[in-house]
Structure formats: C-alpha cells, structure tokens
C-alpha cells in the first residue's frame, strides 16, 4: 500500500510524512525541494506565500525539452533568439519584492516561456503579459494554459514603454534588464503601485523598486545588484524589445 505524500512545505515550516514516518518524494519533487531550500531560501526569499508558490507552479513545464536536466539548477536557461529564463532565485526574489496582492492588476513585460507570468498570475487578480516576439506570446500562453491559468491577457507588441491600453497597473515587472527606465512608464502605475526593473548595463546592474506614493511623487529603492540579459537588442541606433 502506498500513501500519497501530501505537503504544504512552508506554511509553518513543517514537513508531512507518509504512514511509515518516511518522507516519500519523486525525483522531480526532490529537485524542486532542493531548489527552494538550497538556492531560494538562502537568497533572502522567506515569504511563505512565495515559497509555497514555487512549489505549486511546475517550473519544469516552462523549460524547453533539451534543458529539462537543469530545470531546477541555479542558472539561466536559453529559450530562443538570445532570450532566457532567469535563474530560480532571481525570479523568486523579484516576485517577493513586488509584494503582490490578490486584488492587483499587473503588467509583465517580457513573456518568455511564461514562467514569471505564471508566478505573478497565481498571486493576483489579473495580468497583462507583453512580448514583441509572437513566438513567445504563443509559447507563454500555451504553457500557462497547461496549468489552467485563465487570468492572463497575452499581447504581442513593443513593451519598451509599458503598455498604455490596459493601464493603470498596481504593479509592473520587467523580466530582464533595461539600460534606462523611460520616465513615462512610471505614470502607468496606480497610486501605491510598484514597478520593478533591473537597470543598467553589464557589469553593473541594479534591481530597482519604484513606488508611486502620490499622483506626482515616486520613491526609488535599489534592492540588490545582479547581471541579467537585456530585454533590448540594439539595431542601427534603435532599441527593439
């Protein structure tokens, strides 16, 4: 007789065990558990809701077949055309830093494979996810549909200046780095809205949180330093998202 292993790892930091007192976990769940314990918790991601989310949203379903062996590794994963998934610990840190709420209307710029969008959508009311490449719009939508997320609007378009059509937003998340943040994007936030972007150029980039404290005032906080691929590819003095 087998007893299914049912657990909620991080609500109270307790583990639940099978009838014989031994923890039963398949290899994928073991890798996921190790990712959370060894990479993510040690990088100052301690919010129980975020940690539970990382267990519930199956990262491996957003990883290309040829990279399944490193789906939970502390590394960026190539997708297509110089675009990659961010490392698990960075994705988790970004989500935690936005302090997302169930009522939030959120913009994600850079759909990629859809994983960061899926994490966001699992915590909020609805998400608009924008990517200039129709390949990623289709891929992200398919991946999110597989796990039955239905509160996401996927759009193909240039998100370099945000996305005016569905503004204002309670939160805006850029899934890659920007050399500079256009000032106009801030105005797409609601009052008390948060914007998180990694700003700068290698080797010096900073994860920066901007909060709209009033109609005319914004607060800016540098959270940490990192280096990630840019959302922009430069061609003949223009930036293409």
Regions found by a protein language model. Give the residues of each.
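Short intrinsically disordered, low-complexity coil segments enriched in acidic
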Residues: 1-3, 99
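Intrinsically disordered, low-complexity segments enriched in small/polar residues
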Residues: 2, 16-19, 155, 160
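Alpha-helical interaction segments
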Residues: 6-7, 62, 126, 159
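Short, Lys/Arg-enriched N-terminal segments with co-localized hydrophobic residues
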Residues: 7, 12-24
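Class I SAM-dependent transferase core
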Residues: 23-107, 119, 123, 138, ...
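Conserved nucleotide-cofactor-binding alpha/beta core module
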Residues: 99-219
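Substrate-binding/catalytic lobe of Class I Rossmann-like enzymes that use SAM or dcSAM, i.e.
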Residues: 208-213, 220-241
């Amino acid at each position: 007789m087998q007893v299914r292993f049912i657990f909620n790892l991080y609500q109270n930091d307790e583990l639940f065990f099978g009838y014989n007192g031994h923890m039963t976990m398949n290899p994928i769940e073991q890798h996921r558990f190790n990712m959370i314990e060894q990479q993510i918790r040690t990088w100052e991601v301690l919010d129980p809701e975020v940690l539970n989310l990382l267990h519930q949203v199956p990262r491996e379903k957003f990883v290309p077949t040829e990279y399944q062996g490193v789906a939970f590794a502390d590394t960026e994963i190539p997708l297509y055309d110089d675009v990659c998934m961010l490392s698990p610990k960075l994705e988790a840190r970004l989500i935690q830093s936005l302090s997302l709420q169930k009522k939030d209307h959120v913009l994600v710029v850079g759909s990629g494979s859809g994983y960061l969008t899926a994490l966001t959508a699992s915590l909020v009311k609805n998400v608009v996810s924008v990517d200039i490449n129709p390949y990623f719009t289709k891929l992200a939508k398919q991946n999110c549909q597989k796990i039955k997320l239905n509160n996401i609007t996927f759009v193909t378009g240039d998100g370099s200046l945000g996305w005016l059509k569905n503004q204002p937003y309670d939160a805006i998340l850029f899934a890659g780095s920007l050399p500079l943040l256009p000032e106009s994007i801030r105005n797409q936030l609601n009052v008390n809205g948060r914007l998180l972007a990694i700003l700068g150029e290698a080797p010096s980039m900073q994860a920066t949180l901007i909060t709209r404290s009033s109609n005319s005032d914004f607060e800016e906080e540098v959270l940490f330093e990192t280096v990630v691929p840019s959302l922009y590819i430069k061609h003949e003095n223009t930036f293409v998202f």
